[in-house]
């Protein structure tokens, strides 16, 4: 009997922010089993084939696939000097049988490689004939390319290779193949892999009321914690790490024009966007180690000043969040309460609102 991934609404950016345009899970699903709404997502039990591709595509891990329990798989894999993952539809043999090779995310693969564990991916040559192949092959390509991006920046000589056997080697599950030389690393065109995680452009975003944001406790994801293990390297990186759609992490930056509305911090599901304030000061901070690159902060930003940088720097864990924007608090001349304003003002927004209400009632 087929089961379907568990949906955890409080982690979903579409649930957290009603107007989110995130469609990563639906884009990754080759069976059109996912329905999107401003309440989140709904999975069709009839259409779902439990390939786990939707779960792998979700940066907040709102979808949990029981057919691919990542942490349990890693716990078994790290006990071996080498491990072969075989996709279930190919019926090939392997140490771990997974529903689709594309569901093995870059963080998992890079983590194993960083520990010197050689990884073989058996069954990729069957993608063209597989029921999951419509997006499974694209996702696999995306993840393998992301691993090579990591290898080029945080990797070292002890990193093991990730092999994709040719047809003749698939039964043995061994190969000296370098995946960077195959078609799996082609550049995508049209609605390509790099578009799967691209945030909505600011020009298409619409101002939204704060009631569209549902608050929930922040959380961390297993995939982001695996990435941070790789990022916490003692040596200085030779070059900044290029942002990549297969790496569920991002560095947020800000342009001039922040209104201190705090919508980004309210919508952020992981607590990467933070508001810190004292009696006299207000600050918007960003904690890179918590960011999964979901992009909801960019979507919800009403003045459209937040954006993702093209590169990521200072990857190691920092003792405190980086300051994106800071303001001094002002005191209202009428009610004497402290308030925040992007420009000097005599009275606070509450008193301004009272004045507007009074004027509308009495002219």
Show the residue positions of the predicted features.
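Non-ligating segments of multi-cofactor redox enzymes
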Residues: 1-23, 77-281, 288-290, 296-299, ...
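Extreme N-terminal leader/targeting regions
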Residues: 1-62
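ABC transporter nucleotide-binding domain
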Residues: 46, 67-82
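Minor-groove-contacting beta-hairpin "wing" of winged helix-turn-helix DNA-binding domains
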Residues: 41-43, 281-285
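Short, structured interface segments
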Residues: 53-71, 300-314
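Conserved hydrophobic residue
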Residues: 34-35, 63, 273, 306
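A short, hydrophobic/aromatic-rich structural module that often spans a beta strand
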Residues: 42-66, 178, 324, 354-363
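Alpha-helix capping and helix-coil boundary motifs
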Residues: 27, 67-69, 277
């Amino acid at each position: 009997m087929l089961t379907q991934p568990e949906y955890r609404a409080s982690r979903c950016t579409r649930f957290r922010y009603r107007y989110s345009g995130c469609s990563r899970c639906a884009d990754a699903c080759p069976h059109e089993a996912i329905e999107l709404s401003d309440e989140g997502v709904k999975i069709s039990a009839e259409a779902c084939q439990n390939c786990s591709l939707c779960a792998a595509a979700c940066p907040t891990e709102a979808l949990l696939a029981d057919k691919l329990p990542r942490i349990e798989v890693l716990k078994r894999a790290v006990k071996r000097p080498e491990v072969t993952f075989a996709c279930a539809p190919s019926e090939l043999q392997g140490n771990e049988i997974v529903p689709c090779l594309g569901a093995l995310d870059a963080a998992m693969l890079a983590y194993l490689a960083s520990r010197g564990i050689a990884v073989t991916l058996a069954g990729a040559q069957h993608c063209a004939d597989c029921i999951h192949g419509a997006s499974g092959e694209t996702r696999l390509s995306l993840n393998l390319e992301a691993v090579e991006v990591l290898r080029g920046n945080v990797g070292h000589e002890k990193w093991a290779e990730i092999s994709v056997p040719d047809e003749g080697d698939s039964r043995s599950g061994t190969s000296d193949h370098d995946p960077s030389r195959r078609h799996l690393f082609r550049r995508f065109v049209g609605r390509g892999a790099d578009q799967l995680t691209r945030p909505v452009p600011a020009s298409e975003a619409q101002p939204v009321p704060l009631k569209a944001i549902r608050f929930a406790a922040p959380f961390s994801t297993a995939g982001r914690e695996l990435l941070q293990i790789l990022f916490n390297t003692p040596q200085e990186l030779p070059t900044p790490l290029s942002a990549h759609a297969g790496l569920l992490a991002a560095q947020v930056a800000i342009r001039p024009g922040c209104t201190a509305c705090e919508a980004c911090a309210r919508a952020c599901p992981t607590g990467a966007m933070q508001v810190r304030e004292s009696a006299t000061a207000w600050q918007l901070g960003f904690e890179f180690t918590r960011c999964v690159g979901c992009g909801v902060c960019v979507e919800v930003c009403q003045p459209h000043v937040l954006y993702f940088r093209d590169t990521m720097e200072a990857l190691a864990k920092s003792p405190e969040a980086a300051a994106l924007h800071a303001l001094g608090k002002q005191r209202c001349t009428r009610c004497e309460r402290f308030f925040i304003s992007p420009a000097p003002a005599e009275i606070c927004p509450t008193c301004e609102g009272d004045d507007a209400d009074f004027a509308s009632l009495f002219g």
